[in-house]
Amino acid sequence: MAEQILVTTTENIPGRKYEIIGEVFGVTTQSKNAIRDFGAGLKSIVGGEIKAYTSMLTESRDQSIARLRQNASEMGANAVVMMRFDSGSIAGDMQSVVAYGTAVKFID
């Protein structure tokens, strides 16, 4: 059921009326590992994309959206509008990604 929750970055869903349930979040935090750090250190010398970190952030983003959908479903929502991401480092070796928005329920 949670995977059926519509998630959009827009404020409105054309052709749909809904009531606001409230704010909803999906959070994930991942730690870096020694292999990634070693590769990142080498890559920072020569420049270029650090694919291991890009992959970690992409995975974190996907997990945070899945958790956002699950939390919205538990609130009785059909959709999440105005979804945004925020991310940051924790203690220099962890990365946190938050997906957040407004949970809404469609009015038929």
Swiss-Prot record:
InterPro entries cross-referenced by the UniProt entry: UPF0145_dom_sf, UPF0145_YbjQ-like
Q: Which Pfam families match?
A: YbjQ_1 (PF01906)
- Recorded superkingdom: Bacteria
Family note: Belongs to the UPF0145 family.
Q: What is this protein called?
A: UPF0145 protein LJ_1287
Q: Which organism is it from?
A: Lactobacillus johnsonii (strain CNCM I-12250 / La1 / NCC 533)
